Swiss-Prot record:
Its EC number is 3.1.21.4. GO terms for molecular function: DNA binding; type II site-specific deoxyribonuclease activity. Keywords: Endonuclease, Hydrolase, Nuclease, Restriction system. It comes from the Bacteria. The gene is hindVRP. A P subtype restriction enzyme that recognizes the double-stranded sequence 5'-GRCGYC-3'; the cleavage site is unknown. It comes from Haemophilus influenzae (strain ATCC 51907 / DSM 11121 / KW20 / Rd). This is Probable type II restriction enzyme HindVP.
Amino acid sequence: MLYYVPRREKSYMNIKPHLFGLNRSNRDFSLRETWGKNQFNSSFPVSLCCYMSSKGILANYLSIENAEIKCSSIDIKDVFEIEPENENTFFAFETSHSIKLTALPDHTTCDLTDADFGSEIVIRPDSIVYLACSLAEILKESLANCMDIPNNVDHLDWSEPKQVIPLFPHILSTLNNLCSRADTIQTPFLLQPVWKTLGKSPRLADNCLDIFIWSDVAFVKFILEISNLNVNVLSINRQTRTAIWLYKMLVDIVKYGRFNHHKIIDLCSYNTKNDKAFASSGMITNVFMKSERLERPIIMKSEIKNIILGGGQELLSPERRFDAIIYNSSELFR
């Protein structure tokens, strides 16, 4: 007996798992371990950038304009400083840019309107190290002109808040000086892709993906805005500590031509763990990122199949969280 077996329109049986645009990189996407959370969360955003570039879609650019953080547009090739589609382009992960894949909305904004949705962003100490290096690379010898360094800086005990808090006017002056140089020095620094869900549900919104790029100077301004550099403070929070880290790194670059980031971060801990520099909730980030494309991301969920290719989704290993399983198992309560 003969049977008619319809031919499948698409098959990835003979196609290796891969991500759009990442044909040459230091990651092998045919291996399951390459699809683990830590690597996928940086690989996918870069692939998304390549996909958007192939469609002629500009990324959102958070940069300094008239002393304020503004959201404009930037070509992906200007972010990477190379043509993403070029067959000779090689993507070396863990090098040039910080990448922070963020969910939209977070728990502080999920009950608000879409226009007020925001993403929590968690910044690790390494990102502040990269920020200091980026500023030093761009400014070179002129970095010293931006620095407000007191004469007694070499004699300070940086681990002691009572000695560091009087430095706040100098830190404030330095960060403001850097922001005032935005027209000549700012460059793309941090990639913040957003993925949007329907409120706090696990379902993707129809328009669910977009890319926001922070310039290095805009990120300095962001740190400045969320820090409390008032000399009357009684303690140093994470945001303010981050401003201190950045200032100390830049001071050491000017004075010694280098800095020891491990020593600075350990010395300036102020009784707070160093696992992260700081975290800012969606209520805070929305103020700086608010835009039409934050409210309605430009890439549709139906396009994800054009980015994750060759059955790569089957190699993903999402975290198993008990609260998420309970939340998605409504039948348990019937």
